[in-house]
Amino acid sequence: MRLNAQLASLLLSSIVLVGSAHGADEEPVAEKKEASSIERPTFVPTTIKAPFVEQFTDKWDSRWSVSHAKKEDAKSDEEWAYVGEWSVEEPTVFKGIEGDKGLVVKNPAAHHAISAKFPKKIDNKGKTLVVQYEVKLQNSLSCGGAYMKLLQENKKLHSEEFSNASPYVIMFGPDRCGATNKVHFIFKHKNPKTGEYEEKHLKAPPAIKVTKLTSLYTLIVNPDQTFQIRIDGEPLKNGTLLEDFTPPVNPPKEIDDEKDTKPADWVDEEKIPDPEAKKPEDWDEDAPFEIVDTEATKPADWLDDEPTTIPDPEAVKPEDWDDEEDGDWIAPTVPNPKCEEGSGCGKWEPPMIRNPAYKGKWSAPLIDNPAYKGVWAPRKIPNPNYFEDKTPSNFEPMGAIGFEIWTMQNDILFDNIYIGHSIEDAEKFKAETYDIKRPIEEAEEEASKPKLSPQIDDETDISFTQDPIGYVRAKIDRFISLAQDDPIAALQAVPEVGGAIGAILASLLIIIGMFGLSSPAPPAKSTGKTAEKTEKEKTTEAVTASGADSGQGEAKKRAAKSG
């Protein structure tokens, strides 16, 4: 216990020293620029034309409609309403272009829905489809969606509020929560035989970009059924609608015949025991697995006459032990220390070793079964539901765009939406918007990082011998400043502080361990009448603790003992 107290005192002194070093002369160790000197261009609306281009300019609310419908959920009896609010505003984090506004999700942990109808329905038959838009995660994204839906053109689209039940043709964009981290690309395909729609999900979609800077998501679907997904202009996924989606667009030509059954004489066994094999004459199935090691010899320091356990020499008979009532007191036993000093105590017996003659149960070796017919499978028949759609890129006509999302983070900003048929125009639109704002945002991000003051610069002239407190404070300040942006880099740049933290944690673990080891051993378990007496005392204590008269409780105790 004295050692524990010393360790605790030493640890406390270390913590106080570190704290005082960091707290003394509190001066700002990091300085941020009061105002950014980075020049930003002023927003100018694009002149690019397409079936749908949106930059959230004036009168945006005449084009977009916020939904307050009830969200349908067949898996739950609860009703969810789209209560999330939307706003069109400039970015509040790393602004790139002056006056450039976007559509912003305003509420965390809420369902949001908003949509805008196209001036004309978009028919993609025989054309290239290009879907492109910016996403800015101003508050990062740990759990939520930022994807869009291109809604199917139909009568309901013009008569009902937008919700999760609104039929869509394409769903595209980032989604992240828990193990999910992907850029969705889902399209609905109409079965030409049944008329039913089925979702086709992209296999192995790319991961999203989690950054507070603007990210640009682009989907290109070509009339040859190939597609490409780009993030920030970089192609990250290429494939084909006919091969890279599940379930596949086209069903198999043939299917298993459900009425076919395996013949009764069908042989499934590929291997059989060799009928001509015979057990060797010297094969002893009864030989034991282990035998006594006849070559083993008793160690010279083996103590034959010493017992393995002895009465605990430190045990003391309890003061209230009554030999007449409780019987003879017997001290508890402990391992004999003499046995631990030598090879062992008591009667010595040679150890067991594996029997070299052991072979176990004999069985014939396996050989190829001459009657084996292979793995049975039902015969194939033509699929009555088979069809072949060679052009799934001829999507159903689309009449609107919608964002229907749930997110734990607010301030997700959408901007510069392009939906059309020209890759060239989409790239020009990117050059006018994303390519201008992204470098500015990167510069803003860099400028916002803490600027180290001279007192914590690596080139400081402070030495530990000259000023121990100042030296420690400088190291801690530098570590904290760097750790705010990159903990790993902080550990690499200032390993002394990381080592000190590790030492403190190790000391805590040692103290906890020593407290555990120094705790008193549990009392020896009473037997016989002692156990009965203990139970009687517990009963008496319970009566006293319950608030009963103390004198009456003592009388009960004496009566129990005399009985």
From Swiss-Prot:
Please give the start and end residues of each transmembrane region: 497-517
Disulfide links within the chain: 143-177
Residues in compartment: Cytoplasmic? 518-563
Q: Which residues lie on this side of the membrane: Lumenal?
A: 24-496
Ranges of Basic and acidic residues composition bias in the record: 253-281, 530-540
Binding, an alpha-D-glucoside: 147, 149, 168, 175, 404
Q: What residues does Ca(2+) bind to?
A: 100, 415
Q: GO MF terms on file?
A: calcium ion binding; unfolded protein binding
From the Swiss-Prot or TrEMBL record, state where the protein is found. Answer: Endoplasmic reticulum membrane
Functional summary from the UniProt entry: Calcium-binding protein that interacts with newly synthesized monoglucosylated glycoproteins in the endoplasmic reticulum. It may act in assisting protein assembly and/or in the retention within the ER of unassembled protein subunits. It seems to play a major role in the quality control apparatus of the ER by the retention of incorrectly folded proteins.
Name the UniProt record assigns to this protein: Calnexin homolog ARB_00147
The segment annotated Disordered runs over 240-282, 297-325, 521-563
| Originating organism | Arthroderma benhamiae (strain ATCC MYA-4681 / CBS 112371) (Trichophyton mentagrophytes)
Signal peptide region: 1-23
Keywords from UniProt, A to Z, are: Allergen, Calcium, Chaperone, Disulfide bond, Endoplasmic reticulum, Glycoprotein, Membrane, Metal-binding, Signal, Transmembrane, Transmembrane helix
**What does UniProt give as GO cellular component?**
endoplasmic reticulum membrane
Q: Which InterPro entries match?
A: Calret/calnex, Calret/calnex_CS, Calreticulin/calnexin_P_dom_sf, ConA-like_dom_sf
